[in-house]
Amino acid sequence: MENSDVINFSCLEKELHSALQADRKYQRENDAKFRALNQKVASYEEFRDIVLASHLKPLDRNDISGSPRKQPWNPVACRTNYVCASSEQVQPQLSEVQPRSASEFIRDWRRFAGCSFEKYSLLVSLGGEALQKIFSTEIGLGLLGEFLLILSQCLKSGDEDRVTGVLDGLSKTGRFSINLSLLSQAEQEACEELFNKLKVAAGECHPYKDNSNTSVVCEAGLTHMEDNKTDITTTLKELAGKYGTEK
């Protein structure tokens, strides 16, 4: 038998394997295109990103439940102690930060790696509506948990309404339920602690025994709160349900 008549099975196997891979890729990307159209993405960039990421598979709970979560890039989750800058030092920097997309936000977020107070101030200054627009597609992996840790750790008196607005905006972002299901134990506890703080601030007044004007201040505060108490309580209850902290 001549060499030209010999069948090269190895070569045929490689060609068949390549053809199968190309067919799978076509089917996968085609399905991703229809999925992107059904989601009514806002831009071609989002459409392209969904198609390019079509080969990625979502994590199963079994993939993450067996081992502790390690986030060396997240000093708050690791309970790292460091000195926060004062508001006077932070404010000039925050005035220059106006991210309009998720990529711009992440870039600016990483610049504030030295102090959680700076990140807290950034979240509060942007507000829930802006954050909802920035993360309309989804919040980056790990960011939601970091947001909750920072908001719980750095919550300041007087910021309760604005923080509630931030939580409301984040709850309306894309794939929120998926990001919520990926929270670590520490992040879930921080979320519960944050809602407890907000509920206490909305419904209680804590007087100082040595302050002679305490009763007047508390009475004025309670009078002001009575007008908005129902709305605030309802909003917090709805948000607690979305974040899974409602008992």
Curated annotation (Swiss-Prot):
Keyword hit for Oxidoreductase: no
Coiled-coil region: 12-32
Keywords: Cell projection, Cilium, Cilium biogenesis/degradation, Coiled coil, Cytoplasm, Flagellum
Subunit (UniProt): Homodimer.
Protein name: Dynein axonemal assembly factor 19
Biological-process GO terms, alphabetical: axonemal dynein complex assembly; cerebrospinal fluid circulation; cilium assembly; cilium movement; determination of left/right symmetry; embryonic heart tube morphogenesis; epithelial cilium movement involved in extracellular fluid movement; heart jogging
Tissue: Expressed in all cells bearing motile cilia.
Subcellular location: Cytoplasm; Cell projection, Cilium, Flagellum
Job description of the protein: Dynein-attachment factor required for cilia motility.
Induction behaviour: Expression is regulated by foxj1.
Disruption phenotype: Defects in dnaaf19 are the cause of the schmalhans phenotype and show a curved body axis, randomized left-right asymmetry and pronephric kidney cysts, which are characteristic features of ciliopathies. Cilia completely lack both inner dynein arms (IDAs) and outer dynein arms (ODAs) while cilia length in these mutants is not altered.
Any one of the GO CC terms: axoneme
Superkingdom of the organism of origin: Eukaryota
Pfam families: Dynein_attach_N (PF15867), RPAP3_C (PF13877)
Family: Belongs to the DNAAF19/PR46b family.
